[in-house]
Amino acid sequence: MKKFVALMLALVMVLALCACGGDNEEAKTDTETKDYSSMTLDELKAEITTVTEGKLTVATSPDFAPYEFYVADDDGEYKIVGFDMALAQLIADKLGLELEVVPMDFDGTINELGSKKVDLGMAGYSPDPDREGLMNFSSVYYTGGQSFVCTKSTESKFTDLASANNADYTIGAQIGSIQADLAKENTPDANIVEMAKVTDIVADMLAGKMDGAFIETAVAETYAKNYPDLVVKFAVPYDKEGSVVGVNKDNDALLAAVNLIIEEAKADGTIDQYVADANELASGEHFILSGGKIIAEE
């Protein structure tokens, strides 16, 4: 009887060890991560899920020409264009998805990505480390710079960037942007006014309500071409230049796919063409400020 009991106990222990081993193997399998960076685009397409099946949902802030802005078509209907939007369409096409663009204020695009309500954010993002907890960064697809902008009527106030750091001056920047950080860094004594849209900042400068503003260089140059009273006065030092796509942090497969598409589009000149096309459209003779929107008639 004792031998039987001992045999049964030994059997139970063996089975328990096997079960533990099985659990460990299962746990190991569950915790293994796939190497998406080594996959082809076709392989990645099979791995990608999006917030809405069959769609690529992209948040943007369409007040940032030539990155993203509104144009009016022949029927007077507005649509969002720009080289960010051209790249978004390319990504959607390459992945076999329908593109859905959701316009909102700039800081809203970051919040939507952080809450994982969209797949991508494309709003002229710089790879700011403070945003890493809210999104993954793609590789850089466009390298620009930062500028201090004023008007011809205020230009004489500014001999260099340091001269803008004056408590008597009102300096603008977009809410939640790199430019807002640059304003606080370079002009902490000034009255810094953060606004939701770059269009509103430009309108206030033109109306004499603001002495100057920090604006991304390509965007500043686009406005200056269309509004001769604007002056791109100084380059602003910034060591993290370059624009990236913000990717939902739950979607490593999508991040890898976006990087592959960007790499190809940079290599074959596609992005350069997108930038040229967007600059041409945003510099049209019908480019106007209207209701907080940048509108260029096609």
Regions found by a protein language model. Name each.
Residues 15-19:
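C-terminal motif of bacterial Sec signal peptides marking the signal peptidase cleavage site
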Residues 23, 30-39, 85-94, 152-154, ...:
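Extended ligand-binding regions for polar small-molecule ligands
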Residues 27, 32-38, 43-49, 178-195, ...:
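Ligand-binding clefts/hinges and TM-proximal coupling segments of bilobed small-molecule sensing domains
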Residues 28-125:
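Extracytoplasmic small-molecule ligand-binding "clamshell" domains
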Residues 62, 143-152, 217, 221-262, ...:
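Periplasmic-binding protein-like
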Residues 89, 98-163:
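Acidic, polar ligand-binding/catalytic clefts
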Residues 107-108, 125-134, 181-185, 206-207, ...:
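A ligand-binding cleft/hinge motif common to bilobed small-molecule-binding domains
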